Structures are given as C-alpha cells and as structure tokens.
Swiss-Prot record:
Superkingdom to which the source organism belongs: Bacteria
CDD domains in the record: CTPS_N, GATase1_CTP_Synthase
Functional summary from the UniProt entry: Catalyzes the ATP-dependent amination of UTP to CTP with either L-glutamine or ammonia as the source of nitrogen. Regulates intracellular CTP levels through interactions with the four ribonucleotide triphosphates.
Record domain Glutamine amidotransferase type-1: where: 291-542
Listed EC numbers: 6.3.4.2
Gene3D superfamilies: 3.40.50.880, P-loop containing nucleotide triphosphate hydrolases (3.40.50.300)
InterPro entries reported for this sequence: Class_I_gatase-like, CTP_synthase, CTP_synthase_N, GATASE, GATase1_CTP_Synthase, P-loop_NTPase
Organism (species): Shewanella amazonensis (strain ATCC BAA-1098 / SB2B)
Protein name: CTP synthase
Protein family (similarity comment): Belongs to the CTP synthase family.
Region named Amidoligase domain: 1-266
Binding sites annotated in the UniProt record for UTP: S14, K187, T188, K189, P190, T191, Q192, K223
GO BP of this protein: 'de novo' CTP biosynthetic process; pyrimidine nucleobase biosynthetic process
Binding site for Mg(2+): D72, E140
C-alpha cells in the first residue's frame, strides 16, 4: 500500500488546535472511505509523558499496547476509528535515546553522530514506519515554527517532502489571524511572518488553516494567498466554535478534503458526515442537565482529566443531558467536609498519584456511599472507595494503601511485584524500579461477575480496558471485605487481581482499577460512563420529586 503523508505545523502561538484540526481532517478522509492514521511528534526531551506533571503537560493518554502518550492521541481516537499505538507518538528524548543506544553498540561504525543525518534519519524512519498500512498518515509536529526544539523534526519532514514527492506529501500550516477591535479588522501580518519563517526552513505550505474568533473575510483570504504563495482555495478559515465536533463539517464545507484527494490522486466517495451530524444534534438538544463533582488534585488544569471530561460529555449525549462538571480540589474536601460536596448529582474520583489530597477523596467516597449518591471511581478512585469501605464498614481501622502509608496495619492496597503483560510475559518490579517502567499498562481482559451493575452495563461477561497503575487490591483482604458486603465485580484475565468493585444495595456505586475514559468516543460513548450519568439523572429526579 502506498501511504500519503500530510505534515501539520503551527505558527504564531501555541494551542491553536493543531491536534483537533488534524483529527478533524482525518475524520473527513475516513468518512470518504480512506484508511487514516495520525502521528504526533513531540519536541521535548522527555522520553515519554509518563513521568511529566499533569498540571504542566496535561493528561497522559494510554494506548491499547500500553504506550504513555500525548493527550492529542486521545483526540485522534475520539475522531477516527483507527486505534493508536506506540508508533503514533514519539519525542526528541525517545529519538536521542535510541540513537545513543545504537552508537554505544557500535552500529554507526565509529562515525561522528550528528543531528543531520543521524537524528533526522531516525525521525524519518519512525514517520514512515508509523504510516505503513494506511492510505493517509497525518503527522502533527508539536510546538510552533521557530522553536529551537522543533528544528530536527522540521528538517526531517522537509527531507521527507523531497523524498516522497508532491504526489505523496503535502504540508498544512495552522496560523493565527487575530481580530483587532480598535482597528475593526483581522490582521494577516502574523500569518505572513509565520509562513516566512517556515519557508526559511525550506518548507512551503500547501494549505493554510487560519484560526481566529471569526470567519476570515474573502478579501483577507485573497491577501493571505497572495503574500504567502498559497492557492486562495487552500486558505481555510477555521473560526472558534462551541463544539469541536462541528469542525469536520466546517472544513469539508471549504473543500479541504477535496484538495487533499486531488493532490494525492485519490478516487474516493463523498464524505458521509451523518454520524457527526447526529452527535451535533444530540449536543444541541438535551432534555436536561446534571452536575457531576470531579474530586481530584490536578483541577487547576482541566486538561489533566481531558479524556474523563470528554467521556462524561459523551455519556451526556447518550442520555440526552448536558453534563456540567464541577471541579473539586480533594484538599478542600478535607478542609470543608460535606459542604464541599453539596448540590451534586454524582461524584467521580479519577486517577492520580501521590499522597496529597487522598483523604479528601476517601471522604468523597464515604459521602457518596452514605448518601446513596451515584459514585464512579477510576483507578485511584477505586482504591479510595475500597479503603473507605474497609475502614468504616469492614472495621479495618486505619486501613490504607502502602503508597500513602507503609506502616498501615491493614494494607488493603499494595504494590505487586509480579504480573503478566498483554503478551503473556512475566514482568517484575519493586519499589526501586524506575517510575517509567513500574506500571501495569495497556489493554487487558477483565472477567465480569454475572448479575452485577458492571456486567449489566457492558452487557457481557467480560470487557477489555486500559490500565495505568502500580498498586493493586491486596488479595489477602478480599474475603473479609466480601463478607462485609463489598462485591468484587471484575477480575483480571487470570482471576488473581481485582479490577472492579461495587456496592449491591446502592443506586450506583461502581469503581474500576482501569481507565475506561480512554475508549469513550462521541459516536459510541462508554457503557460505564453512560450508566453513571443515567444514575446521576435518576438521582436528580428523585431529589426533585
């Protein structure tokens, strides 16, 4: 299969939405019957985002094969059917690590290792490998043109543009076209300078996507076309919209997909965006609204919980309600108690690491259990629910996780030292292992207990969900907790690890060790999030009646 490549760059400012634009174009091409994938090339020196602070970088998105990747890969999976894997995201750090490893082995036969050609060749090889087996591969370059960190990536795609030729490569550049209120007009000069910078590197953009808070007037598009040496029809206006799921229709209405198909000589059907039209209709026509309290420790940056936020919105679409998310600092729950949790229709405790705020999460689980408020725990959210139950129902005073208290008399959650990965290999770890290599990662099978809310939600005896955690429920306490009334509704493939828990005599108190948010999409939703939102809606109706 001959793969065509679209390289996406950004200029003027960061956070223009390159990831959303790339994903939207991919969605259109997929709707035309093409097999599309997307890659993200990150210029930072970290090997991967796995050990980066969520308040700086945002969420770490986990792929089926266990790669810890940039949150943009979450956008990609929510827009297209193709599943991402570790080939879809790599960093400067990863490239340098691999090149240096080869140098130490003597693979370069004593040559002087340089950015050109050794680093650029490694980047090109990964890009070509990631695109194998697809009609079109869209490659997003992180950062903005002019960043010193991005130069090796930009040089690599410049070389690929020459090597692949015009029939197999094209360049799409996102820029900002700001509106100045005092002048009463949009300004194109930042775009002109951004394109000038890109051309100085040797890359001439084929398509310009102009971001702004309003549509770009026709005369300004003509001006951009003239000064940036881009066809006028290839100057695309991408204004701010109230829903990112409107962007595919906005782009196809301006013929962006036709430009791509014509350039690559692709004969394919017209784009069928009916699924996206249905999503937009559901979003615009809710039958009510609910408020979900998200009790976390990284709430100052909502992107730290990006996939959870989106999964709640998707569940709202399926239940025809608007889901309002109230971010609650778990430390404020420690300080204010029940007052911090008043007025909610449901509580969600997402994943997290470290001791700060954990007692507030435990209090949130207690509040939900005692007040029959729908509760959904994810990863650490399951562990705190189990700790709370152990302390206050099973009578295990001072029960805790060894992550937070190594001297706890009842370590109901602990670090396991051996487990089987997705390929059946035995993995081992201990507390001295590097943080980047100590977690159970990726998609794994979970057996569901018949008659439970979990099995009812999935409509199946099993599910496959993605993991990202170091600590597990201590099997030593399972029978004691079961006797006290806790239901272990999901077990690992070998039935040795607890994957889900729930309370049988509660409207909806369900928690999982995995991260279901990573597989939720606007078109399909996710059964656990749908069940949680439905329970929250039912609780609201009971409260109002």
């Amino acid at each position: 299969m001959t793969t065509r490549y679209i390289f996406v760059t950004g200029g003027v400012v960061s956070s223009l939405g390159k990831g959303i634009a790339a994903a939207s174009l991919a969605a259109i091409l997929e709707a035309r019957g093409l097999n599309v994938t997307i890659m993200k090339l990150d210029p930072y020196i970290n090997v991967d985002p796995g050990t980066m602070s969520p308040t700086q970088h945002g969420e770490v998105f986990v792929t089926e094969d266990g790669a810890e990747t940039d949150l943009d890969l979450g956008h990609y999976e929510r827009f297209i059917r193709t599943k991402m894997n570790r080939r879809n995201n790599f960093t400067t750090g990863r490239i340098y690590e691999e090149v240096l490893r080869k140098e130490r082995r003597g693979d370069y036969l004593g040559a002087t290792i340089q950015v050109i050609p050794h680093i650029t060749n490694a980047i090109k090889a990964k890009v070509l490998e990631g695109g194998e087996g697809h009609d079109v591969a869209i490659v997003e370059i992180g950062g903005t043109v002019g960043d010193i960190e991005s130069l090796p990536f930009l040089e690599s795609i410049r070389q690929l543009g020459v090597e692949l030729g015009r029939d197999r490569s094209m360049f799409m550049h996102l820029t900002l076209v700001p509106f100045l209120g005092a002048a009463g007009e949009v300004k194109t000069k930042p775009t002109q300078h951004s394109v000038k910078e890109l051309r100085s590197i040797g890359i001439a953009p084929d398509i310009l996507v102009c971001r702004g808070d309003r549509a770009i007037p026709a005369n300004e598009r003509a001006k951009i076309s003239l000064f940036c040496n881009v066809e006028e029809r290839a100057v695309i206006s991408l204004k701010d919209v109230d829903s990112i799921y409107k962007i595919p229709a906005l782009l196809t209405s301006q013929g962006l997909d036709d430009l791509v198909c014509k350039r690559f000589h692709l004969e394919c059907k017209e784009a069928d965006l009916s699924e996206w039209e249905n999503v937009i209709y559901q979003e615009a026509n809710p039958n009510g609204e609910i408020t979900i309290g998200m009790v976390g420790k990284y709430i100052e940056l909502p992107d730290a919980y990006k996939s959870v936020n989106e999964a709640l919105k998707h569940a709202g679409l399926k239940n025809r309600v608007t889901v309002n998310i109230k971010y609650i600092d778990s430390q404020s729950v420690e300080a204010k108690g029940d007052e911090a949790l008043a007025g909610l229709d449901g509580i969600l405790v997402p994943g997290g690491f470290g001791e700060r705020g954990v007692e507030g999460k435990i209090l949130a689980a207690k509040y939900a259990r005692e007040n029959e408020l729908p509760y959904f725990g994810i990863c650490l959210g399951m562990q705190v629910a189990l700790i709370e139950f152990a302390r206050n129902v099973a009578g295990l005073t001072d029960a805790h996780s060894t992550e937070f208290n190594k001297q706890t008399p009842h370590p109901v959650v602990g670090l396991i030292t051996e487990w089987i990965d997705e390929e059946g290999n035995i993995e081992q770890r201990d507390e001295a292992s590097d943080l980047g290599g100590t977690m159970r990662l990726g998609a794994q099978l979970c057996h569901l207990k018949a008659g439970t809310k979990a099995a009812e939600a999935y409509g199946s005896e099993s599910c496959i969900e993605r993991h990202r955690h170091r600590y597990e429920v201590n099997n030593h306490y399972v029978k004691q907790l079961e006797k006290a009334g806790l239901v272990f509704s999901g077990l690992s493939s070998d039935r040795k690890l607890v994957e889900m828990i729930e309370l049988p005599n509660h409207p909806w108190f369900v928690a999982g060790q995995f991260h279901p948010e990573f597989t939720s999409t606007p078109r399909d939703g996710h059964p656990l999030f749908e069940g949680f939102v439905a329970a929250a809606r039912a609780h609201q109706k009971r409260s109002l009646s």
